[in-house]
Curated annotation (Swiss-Prot):
The keyword GTP-binding applies. This is Signal recognition particle 54 kDa protein. Belongs to the GTP-binding SRP family. SRP54 subfamily. One of its GO terms (cellular component) is signal recognition particle. Pfam families: SRP54, SRP54_N, SRP_SPB. InterPro entries: AAA+_ATPase (IPR003593), P-loop_NTPase (IPR027417), Signal_recog_part_SRP54_M_sf (IPR036891), Signal_recog_particl_SRP54_hlx (IPR013822), Signal_recog_particle_SRP54_M (IPR004125), SRP/SRP_N (IPR036225), SRP54 (IPR022941), SRP54_GTPase_dom (IPR000897). The gene is srp54. It is an enzyme of class 3 (hydrolase). Part of the signal recognition particle protein translocation system, which is composed of SRP and FtsY. Archaeal SRP consists of a 7S RNA molecule of 300 nucleotides and two protein subunits: SRP54 and SRP19. SUPFAM superfamilies: Domain of the SRP/SRP receptor G-proteins, P-loop containing nucleoside triphosphate hydrolases, Signal peptide-binding domain. One of its GO terms (biological process) is SRP-dependent cotranslational protein targeting to membrane. Involved in targeting and insertion of nascent membrane proteins into the cytoplasmic membrane. Binds to the hydrophobic signal sequence of the ribosome-nascent chain (RNC) as it emerges from the ribosomes. The SRP-RNC complex is then targeted to the cytoplasmic membrane where it interacts with the SRP receptor FtsY. It catalyses: GTP + H2O = GDP + phosphate + H(+).
Length: 444
């Protein structure tokens, strides 16, 4: 998860509030100090932190909780709302025909982001093309072409042509039939005058619907200087913050952008083509505080087009085979890293803490389960009850695991089957269908 340290510290502050017997000035002051410390360690601007602290304190001590909400819940909700206000609501890039120009310094992850952004739109049903107008950096053409080829995205570039505005113009002509056209531009190691002029020249040719500034999260509060400089040059309409999963300064970058007239459109949270997320402040803060992001989880399932032929009607009658369980593990594997998926799930409002070691153990256990099921016969997968001691030994040998782990898998399957049977009374067939659909299942 992005900003692990910040999220952990903020959750610690909220847990104090949630476990308190009463809300008073001492409790609020203590929680505010913890929040201040967490934000400052994440490189958020001191003035912004103090302003946020004052608003939280003022509201927590003077506002009356709305009907149906106790004082503790109200204070937690205030913190949630004010954190959203701190980082801004985000820039909405609609799913429609458009041209997008990417700008930014060298090393910001701009080229990789161009391919990720193209993948984002293409997976949502839009024909997408990428134009390489970076004629400055050696290897930019080859890198971007390879990334696009890997994802099946149309690529346009002119190797050897150093006239970036001309390449951009030719690229637009060659990609007229595409819905979304993404123009990748050159960067420099600093805000040099020739870089700014080239951006202006390309902008004059491209006339993009959106000009997105790509920034490395590690620059922290310096993000505001970049945003202002590029905004003056081309009038940027949004920001993409990359590498947010690998720095403690991400809070500074997020808040610095919000301090300017622009806002964040996307965030990069990993290395794969799907690790670019549309930025929505409420969902981001919800995940940061451990409240989950079910909407994001559903979108992730839909994005990788998870399909399964699980028979929902049979499941509702109590039939949940090991084959069904295997399909669910396969679906989870497609959706991305286990830690990222689990952090989209809500756990009691404030979240639970799992160490990296615990996540790794869980991941290895699930992988072992798949190996075990790969060593079973179709008959065993359909009817686990026939798996006796001798079969367990054979399956363990075939999968390179211990018999105890095979038994553990069978117990886990039995528990899941029991839970599904329990849904029949409380959830109902239609609601079960809706749930499966929301988790990426096709209609049944």
């Amino acid at each position: 998860m992005v900003l692990d340290n910040l999220g952990g510290s903020l959750r610690g502050a909220l847990k104090k509030i949630a476990s308190a017997t009463r809300v008073d000035k001492a409790l609020v002051d203590d929680a505010v100090r913890d929040i201040q410390r967490a934000l400052l360690q994440a490189d958020v601007n001191v003035k912004l932190v103090m302003s946020l602290s004052n608003r939280i304190r003022e509201r927590a001590l003077n506002e009356k909780p709305p009907a149906g909400m106790n004082p503790r819940e109200h204070v937690i909700n205030i913190v949630y709302q004010e954190l959203i206000n701190l980082i801004g609501r985000g820039t909405d890039i609609p799913l429609k025909k458009q041209t997008i120009m990417l700008v930014g310094l060298q090393g910001s992850g701009k080229t990789t982001t161009a391919a990720k952004l193209a993948t984002y739109f293409q997976r949502r049903g839009l024909r997408t093309a990428v134009i390489c107008a970076d004629t400055f950096r050696a290897g930019a053409y080859d890198q971007l072409k390879a990334l696009c080829d890997r994802q099946g995205i149309f690529f346009y570039g002119e190797k050897g042509n150093e006239n970036a505005p001309e390449v951009a113009k030719n690229g637009l002509e060659a990609t007229k039939k595409y819905d979304v056209r993404i123009v990748d531009t050159a960067g420099r190691h600093a805000l040099e005058s020739d870089l700014i002029q080239e951006m202006k020249d390309i902008h004059a040719v491209v006339n993009a619907d959106h000009k997105l500034l790509v920034m490395d999260a590690a620059i922290g509060q310096q993000a505001s200087e970049q945003a202002r400089a590029f905004n003056e040059a081309v009038g940027i309409t949004g920001v993409i913050i990359t590498k947010l999963d690998g720095t403690a300064k991400g809070g500074g970058a997020l808040s610095a952008v919000a301090e300017t007239k622009t806002s964040v459109a996307f965030i990069g949270v990993g290395e794969t083509a799907s690790d670019l997320e549309k930025f929505e402040a409420d969902r981001f803060i919800s995940r940061l505080l451990g409240m989950g992001d079910i909407k994001g989880l559903i979108e992730k399932a839909q994005e990788v087009q998870i399909e399964s032929d699980v028979d929902v009607d049979a499941m509702m009658k109590g039939k949940f085979t090991l084959k069904d369980m295997y399909k669910q593990l396969e679906a989870m594997n497609k959706m991305g890293p286990l830690k990222q998926i689990m952090q989209m799930l809500p756990f009691g409002g404030i979240g639970i803490e799992l160490s990296d070691k615990e996540y790794q153990v869980t991941k290895e256990r699930l992988e072992a389960y798949r190996f075990i099921m790969d060593s079973m016969t179709d008959e065993e997968l359909e009817d686990p009850k026939i798996i006796n001691a001798s079969r367990i030994k054979r399956i363990a040998r075939g999968s390179g695991t211990r018999p105890e782990l095979v038994k553990e898998l069978l117990k886990s399957h039995a528990a899941m089957q029991k839970a599904i049977k329990g849904m029949r009374g409380g959830m109902g067939r239609m609601n079960m269908k809706k749930l499966m659909k929301r988790l990426g299942q096709p209609k049944v």
